[in-house]
Amino acid sequence: MLSARDRRDRHPEEGVVAELQGFAVDKAFLTSHKGILLETELALTLIIFICFTASISAYMAAALLEFFITLAFLFLYATQYYQRFDRINWPCLLQGHGQSGGPHPLDLLSHSAKVQPQPWPGLTPPGWHTPAAVPWVPAPAPGFWSWLLWFICFHSLGSSDFLRCVSAIIIFLVVSFAAVTSRDGAAIAAFVFGIILVSIFAYDAFKIYRTEMAPGASQGDQQ
């Protein structure tokens, strides 16, 4: 173990190398079945974003959001970085943060000072608050973002990945059929790629459910 003085006095390159080792990419995963699925989803999402940029710019935000979400999951899987914060005890963290008088962590998601966060009974755990509406992302329902964060924190990465695939299927189905009505060449191309992407997301969700979620449910029934 290095002391505080040793860490401060060591050569800067040593710290950079240590940080890079923490984000080592598993090349075997990138060529695996799951890695190829994520890379295909990432490429098709980027193509759809380009098509929407050239035709209907109002729909490109959905494709861009899914692109960054898929990129984040590819990073977590390829680096296995999710193992460092799997099942974090967020309620204790939030309770301690609130007692210290600091801002609520979920309130940091808000970009609007006019909308006050409100609790969402039923889905939001006790002590949690709904973040205020984010201007550049439409809120589907009150408390959606806090519920999504709660789901990701308290479930495995496979369950969160399953939720990502299901939400992407719904989003791209709606956006693709809405874009094809414009009869623009780029919009029609986005519709075709969107249908292909939806089928890939559906296959990915099926594989996740069959390999990670179904065995856990069967073990729970046996107990």
Curated annotation (Swiss-Prot):
Tissue expression profile of the protein: Highly expressed in the brain.
Signal peptide: none
Gene Ontology cellular component terms for the protein in this record: extracellular space; membrane
Residues passing through the membrane, by range: 35-55, 56-76, 162-182, 186-206
Primary localisation category: membrane
InterPro entries (alphabetical): Marvel (IPR008253), MARVEL-CKLF_proteins (IPR050578)
Domain MARVEL: 29-213
Disulfide cross-links: none
GO molecular function: cytokine activity
Swiss-Prot/TrEMBL keywords: Chemotaxis, Cytokine, Membrane, Transmembrane, Transmembrane helix
Membrane topology: Multi-pass membrane protein
Family label: Belongs to the chemokine-like factor family.
Protein name: CKLF-like MARVEL transmembrane domain-containing protein 5
UniProt source species: Homo sapiens (Human)
